[in-house]
Amino acid sequence: MDKKMKRTRIADALHGGLVGQEINIKGWVRTKRGNKAVNFIALNDGSTIHNMQIVADLASFDAAQMSQITTGACIGVIGTLVESQGAGQSVEVQASAIEIYGTADPATYPLQKKGHTLEFLREIAHLRPRTNTFGAIYRIRHHMAIAIHTFFHNKGYYYFHAPLITASDCEGAGQMFQVTTLNPDSLPRTEEGQVDYRKDFFGRHTSLTVSGQLEGEMAAMALGGIYTFGPTFRAENSNTPRHLAEFWMIEPEVAFLEIEDNMDLAEEFIKYCVQWALDNCMDDISFLSEHFDKELIDRLKFVLEKPFVRLAYTEGIRILEEAVKNGVKFEFPIYWGADLASEHERYLVEVHFKTPVIMTDYPKEIKSFYMKLNDDGKTVRGMDVLFPKIGEIIGGSEREADYDKLVARANEMGVPEKDIWWYLDSRRYGTAPHSGFGLGFERLLLFVTGMSNIRDVIPFPRTPNNAEF
């Protein structure tokens, strides 16, 4: 083969502008079929869901070499791009030279030409990117990341890197992964018999972050508008299709935004991401819709059609209580003060309003200490964006900007002042109204791909009893 000829991506070759030209394509064999005279090889290089058909005239190739071209093998092909004679593709490559880079033994290669369950593919997460399904998901994942950066960059917000190792529990959930270099077989002890973390690497107890919000707020108080986008960690022992121990979060924090502005930003942001997916990932979305979720494209368009409903928590509870009176059955009870379950959120979105909902003004007891207290003294300016199929997709609030009120709320919620002294400083010096929210990246991907298990939208899922690869 001509080593100097530049490789053409299959996605570019399929556009048809190169018909009649000699091209060099490389990729992995999906299938091979044929007869004694000719072989048809379906080749994929990851640039598109679509394969390139390679037509190999067996009179021109060594039989031993051709026998090594099996599903999973990696090959390079030089040939002429021509309009296809057969159905199923518009163009194909008439091969003049083939080089085999790597073989795949059909006796052991697990991705043969047949359907595989998602459960099976999770067990071989190192190979599942080679399937059509996961190629589509990972391309969409890339595009959603680009959409997020583009949206905030165009807004004039700055990408801010919050630390992954932290000494604070932002959410007060207590489900954090500890970071330590201490030897468990010979732990240093204080006089009281407690582990002496002063002897640890950081000189104190540290954990992996559950959120970059608090640090993000510090940056917003100087840069005006920022967003974080990085991994977060929760040591929550939940083996469900909605939970991961390691996932990615997008968290904008913006000075001078009040709760109404925050809701507007969240709606504009999520609609931008969905529109980006429809504009840039339609081939992959169509494939996933056909195979996993026939209503996917309609659901994506549904989000874009109308303004999101703004709904106070108290009114939401009234609607749900009314539904129960009218015979609707919920697994979890409804009462003022309850933290809504996914079934309640989905009822409001899918049945009652038939449009996404932004719920606001939650009871202070079920929300975090940093949320701004309303004048009623009972509710806070929290807001959750509720979506069809998945329930809550975004959670945020206007932050408490008043130093005394923030200290009082921290004490109320059992958050020690000594642990958040630096956070309180932002209210002590030049405080300002500000707001923000968090979007779980994988939650967004569940919605955009139509997949039903969160372990299928991240390359290597980390869950209880599973840290393979």
Curated annotation (Swiss-Prot):
InterPro entries in the record: Aa-tRNA-synt_II (IPR004364), aa-tRNA-synth_II (IPR006195), aa-tRNA-synth_II/BPL/LPL (IPR045864), Asn-tRNA-ligase (IPR004522), Asp/Asn-tRNA-synth_IIb (IPR002312), NA-bd_OB-fold (IPR012340), NA-bd_OB_tRNA (IPR004365)
Swiss-Prot/TrEMBL catalytic activity: tRNA(Asn) + L-asparagine + ATP = L-asparaginyl-tRNA(Asn) + AMP + diphosphate + H(+)
Gene3D superfamilies: Bira Bifunctional Protein, Domain 2 (3.30.930.10), Nucleic acid-binding proteins (2.40.50.140)
Keywords, alphabetical: Aminoacyl-tRNA synthetase, ATP-binding, Cytoplasm, Ligase, Nucleotide-binding, Protein biosynthesis
Superkingdom in the source lineage: Bacteria
Cellular component terms (Gene Ontology): cytoplasm
Main location class: cytoplasm
Protein's name in the database: Asparagine--tRNA ligase
Organism encoding this protein: Porphyromonas gingivalis (strain ATCC BAA-308 / W83)
